[in-house]
Amino acid sequence: MELELDAGDQDLLAFLLEESGDLGTAPDEAVRAPLDWALPLSEVPSDWEVDDLLCSLLSPPASLNILSSSNPCLVHHDHTYSLPRETVSMDLESESCRKEGTQMTPQHMEELAEQEIARLVLTDEEKSLLEKEGLILPETLPLTKTEEQILKRVRRKIRNKRSAQESRRKKKVYVGGLESRVLKYTAQNMELQNKVQLLEEQNLSLLDQLRKLQAMVIEISNKTSSSSTCILVLLVSFCLLLVPAMYSSDTRGSLPAEHGVLSRQLRALPSEDPYQLELPALQSEVPKDSTHQWLDGSDCVLQAPGNTSCLLHYMPQAPSAEPPLEWPFPDLFSEPLCRGPILPLQANLTRKGGWLPTGSPSVILQDRYSG
């Protein structure tokens, strides 16, 4: 009996045989092999066995399901070759073995199906978070949409938590670095403040020294100025004392002494006035024979009581004449004989004596001290 397979089944069987490695035994014969297989009636499998085999072959394992769900990737295989007849032939030695194989095939397929069922693997964080939220997910796949949303939300929370922890860790490291820099800069600031205080103290000490030096300079300048002024005053006073003495000693022998004459003119009285000036001392001391000589304009020295003497100088004047002039007497007095003022006296002598002329004579009286 020949088993006829369609094109899809033939491709599937060719893929399986290629994976098992039996394809390379007779490549030349496989090309010339016919497509129909001649199997005995006892070796023909039943329909349900073929269905189970195909289901077991077509259903992927759990690991492949998880990988395909996380990262789907489609793999396409092109099968454009024919299968040889010898590759699919089965050589069974006995019927017992064939019966046992037919009896063990369903159990084996169930075990394989149980092993190949996809299981949901959760981490400890996911389990703890689900327990906190009071959610329960099944351990097998596939999951419903709500369960998938719950699982995604839980995983998103875990990712956010990890990212927050990482950001906190980085922030902590950054803050620690800033704190260390702040401590270092504060230490440097304290050192600089100490240096500034030291420099301020040095500046104050230098200012004190400068003030002391300025005070010393001012004192020295005041002392020098006072001493110089004192010396200058002494020199000026010495010069003032020496110059007049030198001038007087030089001029005493060479130049005649100049005497100033202070004159006073008495008012002329008429002859009819009974109160006329009488000079008894003059009448007693001046002789009569020398009256005309004295009246002619000569000088006469009269001794007054005490240490004073009077110089009488007679100058006849007309009634309408001007006051008498002052005459110096350098010949009579070579030395300063008169310490007091020289007073010119103008008087009208009495005519009873007979020695006064008609006119207004003037008399000069000069005091003379006799030491």
UniProtKB/Swiss-Prot annotation:
Entry keywords, A to Z: Activator, Chemotaxis, Cytoplasm, DNA-binding, Endoplasmic reticulum, Glycoprotein, Golgi apparatus, Host-virus interaction, Membrane, Nucleus, Repeat, Repressor, Signal-anchor, Transcription, Transcription regulation, Transmembrane, Transmembrane helix, Unfolded protein response
UniProt region (Basic motif), positions on chain: 152-184
Result when mutating R267G: Inhibits proteolytic cleavage and transcriptional activation
Domain bZIP span(s) in chain numbering: 150-213
UniProt motif (LXXLL motif 1) ranges: 13-17
Family under the similarity heading: Belongs to the bZIP family. ATF subfamily.
Pfam families: bZIP_1 (PF00170)
Region (Leucine-zipper): 192-213
Glycosylated residues, chain numbering: N307, N348
Lumenal side: 248-371
Upregulation: Up-regulated upon differentiation of monocytes towards immature dendritic cells (DC). Down-regulated upon DC maturation. Up-regulated by endoplasmic reticulum stress triggered by thapsigargin (Tg) or tunicamycin (Tm). Up-regulated by CCR1-dependent chemokines in an immediate early response and biphasic manner and by NF-kappa-B.
Tissue occurrence: Ubiquitously expressed. Expressed in dendritic cells (DC). Weakly expressed in monocytes (at protein level).
Cytoplasmic-facing ranges: 1-230
Membrane-spanning residues: 231-247
Stated consequence of mutating N160G: Does not bind to DNA but retains its ability to interact with HCFC1. Reduces transcriptional activation of unfolded protein response elements (UPRE)-containing promoter. Colocalizes with HCFC1 in the ER membrane
InterPro entries membership: bZIP, bZIP_sf, CREB_ATF_subfamily
GO annotations of cellular component type: chromatin; cytoplasm; cytosol; endoplasmic reticulum; endoplasmic reticulum membrane; Golgi apparatus; Golgi membrane; membrane
Name of encoding gene: CREB3
Known role: Endoplasmic reticulum (ER)-bound sequence-specific transcription factor that directly binds DNA and activates transcription. Plays a role in the unfolded protein response (UPR), promoting cell survival versus ER stress-induced apoptotic cell death. Also involved in cell proliferation, migration and differentiation, tumor suppression and inflammatory gene expression. Acts as a positive regulator of LKN-1/CCL15-induced chemotaxis signaling of leukocyte cell migration. Associates with chromatin to the HERPUD1 promoter. Also induces transcriptional activation of chemokine receptors.
GO terms classed as biological process: chemotaxis; DNA-templated transcription; endoplasmic reticulum unfolded protein response; establishment of viral latency; induction of positive chemotaxis; integrated stress response signaling; negative regulation of cell cycle; negative regulation of endoplasmic reticulum stress-induced intrinsic apoptotic signaling pathway
Subunit structure: Homodimer. Isoform 1 interacts with HCFC1; the interaction is required to stimulate CREB3 transcriptional activity. Isoform 1 interacts with CREBZF; the interaction occurs only in combination with HCFC1. Isoform 1 interacts (via central part and transmembrane region) with DCSTAMP (via C-terminus cytoplasmic domain). Isoform 1 interacts with OS9. Isoform 1 interacts (via leucine-zipper domain) with CREBRF (via leucine-zipper domain); the interaction occurs only after CREB3 activation and promotes CREB3 degradation. Isoform 1 interacts (via C-terminal domain) with CCR1. (Microbial infection) Interacts with the HCV core protein; homodimerization is prevented by the HCV core protein. Isoform 1 interacts (via leucine-zipper and transmembrane domains) with HIV-1 TMgp41 (via cytoplasmic domain); the interaction reduces CREB3 stability. Processed cyclic AMP-responsive element-binding protein 3 interacts with HIV-1 Tat.
Motif LXXLL motif 2 in this chain: 54-58
Motif (HCFC1-binding-motif (HBM)): 78-81
Swiss-Prot/TrEMBL site (Cleavage) positions: S263, R264, L266, R267
PTM statement from Swiss-Prot or TrEMBL: First proteolytically cleaved by site-1 protease (S1P) that generates membrane-associated N-terminus and a luminal C-terminus forms. The membrane-associated N-terminus form is further proteolytically processed probably by the site-2 protease (S2P) through a regulated intramembrane proteolysis (RIP), releasing the transcriptional active processed cyclic AMP-responsive element-binding protein 3 form, which is transported to the nucleus. The proteolytic cleavage is strongly induced during dendritic cell (DC) maturation and inhibited by DCSTAMP. That form is rapidly degraded.
Sequence segments annotated as region (Transcription activation (acidic)): 1-92
Protein name, as recorded: Cyclic AMP-responsive element-binding protein 3
